[in-house]
């Protein structure tokens, strides 16, 4: 890492700039233009333009990377990530309610329905089933609407509640039809029947359908590119907004000098953001070189990165949050390349995922392993402590169905 350290800006300048412009470093690439404009609102010298290119492959001379780069431009934000961001006060005000909510998320199937046994899940968490169910009902306030329901009827009821209809009679008619979906034609002569039916047809079925059908575009900050003589890091500079100065419009004055300094500080902050992200890419390439060649991730902690930049782990964590890296293996959140801190263990999350895959591959097809059992086996093998929702998250990232879903699939194949 000596080369990386030698290229870092002087510590004092780095600290001063980051303290003043930390939001620029932490912002997502998609939001960077707006963040810069907010900083430049009162400065007539600054002009900000977005030069984002439409085709990422235009920037690469390496033929191999150009062929695949189109596939790097988008990545899917999972249902898990979308819901996890909503598990906050005031809807989930306590640690217990948040713990239950995360457990519920981990028990959702790909369509967004909760099919797990509430009594069993509550027992594992050490809470009353009534408390667990109360938290689950709060999912009616989350997006996507209908998520966390047990079945279609309850999902429709959740979505109905989220509509907040002013017409109470229309609400009651719609609710009645939902509760009697199998025989809704019996109400066809009701005054509000057609209006209620129109509302029902607008509901999402299944509730997570948007996550099954489409991907949300993300713009990678970094590209790890294979070239003839090795692998290199390239910053996605073409997606950055540009800052230009229009100082010729004003005569020399104290006001101009002050605004000119502010403008140059903003440019320095943007350049520092680029340099910081690029150096993160250099470090990842150095530490995770084997991964980019098709092998497994090495254990790497955020603390290692924080030490390189002389900043706290929390600052670095915020700096890489919601930022992506594209390589031949796909598009990944930058945080993907760091091990999860597990009681100071050096065990990489990639190693745990591999073992999880092995367990699923060799499980009893009649009695598939629950996440709780997988947790028990992993803790025993690696001599560490984890929480079950971490296992569930790993399973979902690996596109492995829940134990109940796997059991149904095994029966279908038998």
From Swiss-Prot:
Keyword line: DNA-binding, DNA-directed RNA polymerase, Nucleotidyltransferase, Sigma factor, Transcription, Transcription regulation, Transferase
Superkingdom of source: Bacteria
GO biological process: DNA-templated transcription initiation; regulation of DNA-templated transcription
Motif RPON box positions after renumbering to this chain: 387-395
InterPro entries given in the database record: RNA_pol_sigma_54, RNA_pol_sigma_54_core-bd, RNA_pol_sigma_54_DNA-bd, RpoN_core-bd_sf
Pfam families associated with the record: Sigma54_AID (PF00309), Sigma54_CBD (PF04963), Sigma54_DBD (PF04552)
UniProt GO cellular component terms: DNA-directed RNA polymerase complex; protein-DNA complex
DNA-binding region boundaries: 301-320
Gene Ontology molecular-function annotations: DNA-binding transcription activator activity; nucleotidyltransferase activity; sigma factor activity; transcription cis-regulatory region binding
Cleavable signal peptide: none
Function: Sigma factors are initiation factors that promote the attachment of RNA polymerase to specific initiation sites and are then released.
Protein family membership: Belongs to the sigma-54 factor family.
Protein name: RNA polymerase sigma-54 factor
Organism phylogeny: Bacteria, Pseudomonadati, Campylobacterota, Epsilonproteobacteria, Campylobacterales
Gene that produces this protein: rpoN
């Amino acid at each position: 890492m000596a080369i990386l350290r030698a290229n870092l800006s002087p510590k004092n300048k780095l600290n001063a700039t980051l303290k003043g412009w930390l939001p620029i470093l932490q912002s997502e690439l998609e939001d960077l233009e707006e963040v810069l404009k907010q900083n430049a609102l009162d400065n007539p010298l600054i002009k900000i333009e977005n030069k984002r290119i439409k085709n990422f492959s235009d920037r690469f001379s390496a033929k191999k990377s150009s062929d695949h780069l189109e596939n790097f431009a988008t990545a899917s934000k999972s249902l898990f990530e979308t819901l996890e961001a909503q598990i906050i006060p005031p809807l989930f005000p306590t640690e217990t309610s948040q713990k239950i909510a995360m457990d519920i998320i981990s028990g959702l199937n790909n369509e967004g329905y909760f099919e797990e046994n509430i009594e069993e899940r509550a027992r594992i968490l050490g809470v009353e089933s009534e408390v667990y169910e109360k938290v689950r009902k709060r999912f009616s306030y989350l997006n996507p609407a209908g998520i966390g329901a047990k079945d279609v009827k309850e999902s429709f009821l959740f979505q109905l509640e989220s509509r907040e209809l002013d017409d109470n009679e229309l609400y009651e008619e719609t609710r009645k039809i939902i509760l009697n979906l199998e025989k809704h034609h019996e109400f066809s002569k009701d005054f509000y029947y057609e209006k209620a039916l129109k509302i029902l047809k607008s509901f999402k079925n299944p509730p997570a359908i948007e996550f099954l059908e489409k991907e949300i575009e993300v713009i990678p900050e970094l590209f790890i590119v294979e070239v003839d003589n090795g692998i290199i890091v390239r910053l996605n500079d073409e997606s950055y907004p540009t800052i230009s100065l229009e100082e010729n419009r004003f005569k020399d004055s104290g006001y101009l000098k002050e605004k000119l300094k502010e403008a140059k500080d903003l440019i320095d902050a943007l350049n520092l953001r680029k340099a910081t992200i690029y150096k993160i890419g250099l470090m990842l390439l150095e530490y995770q070189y084997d991964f980019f060649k098709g092998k497994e991730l090495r254990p790497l902690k955020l603390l290692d990165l924080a030490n390189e930049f002389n900043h706290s782990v929390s600052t670095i964590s915020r700096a890489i949050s919601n930022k992506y890296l594209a390589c031949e293996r796909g598009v990944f959140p930058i945080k993907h390349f760091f091990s999860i801190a597990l009681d100071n263990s050096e065990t990489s999350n990639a190693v745990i995922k591999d073992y999880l895959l092995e367990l699923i591959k060799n499980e009893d097809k009649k009695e598939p392993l629950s996440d709780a059992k997988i947790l028990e086996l992993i803790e025993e093998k690696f001599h560490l402590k984890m929480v079950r929702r971490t296992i569930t998250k790993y399973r979902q990232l690996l596109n492995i169905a829940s134990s109940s879903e796997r059991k149904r699939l095994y029966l279908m194949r038998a």
